[in-house]
Amino acid sequence: MSILKKPDLNDPELRAKLAKGMGHNYYGEPAWPNDLLYIFPVVILGSIACCGGLAVLDPALIGEPADPFSTPLEILPEWYFFPVFQILRVIPNKLLGVVLMAAVPAGLIAVPFIENVNKFQNPFRRPVASAVFLFGTFVAIWLGIGATFPIDKSLTLGLF
């Protein structure tokens, strides 16, 4: 059964509304004023209230104060830079590491041209794009986890 109720076009009341121009050439409620004036402010204020409530009820600790005279053993970047950091750390030639990082967006740009004969949107019917996505996700996660290990165990994650 469908979630959406299809309109009964034989209903004289609906036909009269559509003849007057209500519906804006589509079925359903207009965005103004129903959504934009009433629902959006409720959602925005609710989101602000949830964030404010969480900030008051469970404040995040700032952590221990920074000590400029003691440097940690290994300085790690933010978590979203872990794969890039791992590439630069493992590849001995830094120019090659930068070229590899530039190859990632170049490869992503090339995917539609490689698979230009396939017009499907379903990922199961687009094997090249799906394979590139799965391989890239696996490599990014592997490199990201490896960045947290010492350099001698970073590529194997200590498994081998």
From Swiss-Prot:
One of its GO terms (molecular function) is electron transporter, transferring electrons within cytochrome b6/f complex of photosystem II activity. It is a multi-pass membrane protein. One of its GO terms (cellular component) is cyanelle thylakoid membrane. PROSITE patterns: CYTB_CTER. InterPro entries: Cyt_b/b6_C, Cyt_b/b6_C_sf, Cyt_b6/f_cplx_suIV, Cytochrome_b_C_euk/bac. One of its GO terms (biological process) is photosynthetic electron transport chain. The chain crosses the membrane at residues 36-56, 95-115, 131-151. Gene3D superfamilies: plastocyanin oxidoreductase, Single helix bin. Its main location: plastid. It is found in: Plastid, Cyanelle thylakoid membrane. Component of the cytochrome b6-f complex, which mediates electron transfer between photosystem II (PSII) and photosystem I (PSI), cyclic electron flow around PSI, and state transitions. PANTHER family: CYTOCHROME B. The 4 large subunits of the cytochrome b6-f complex are cytochrome b6, subunit IV (17 kDa polypeptide, petD), cytochrome f and the Rieske protein, while the 4 small subunits are petG, petL, petM and petN. The complex functions as a dimer. Belongs to the cytochrome b family. PetD subfamily. This is Cytochrome b6-f complex subunit 4. It comes from Cyanophora paradoxa.
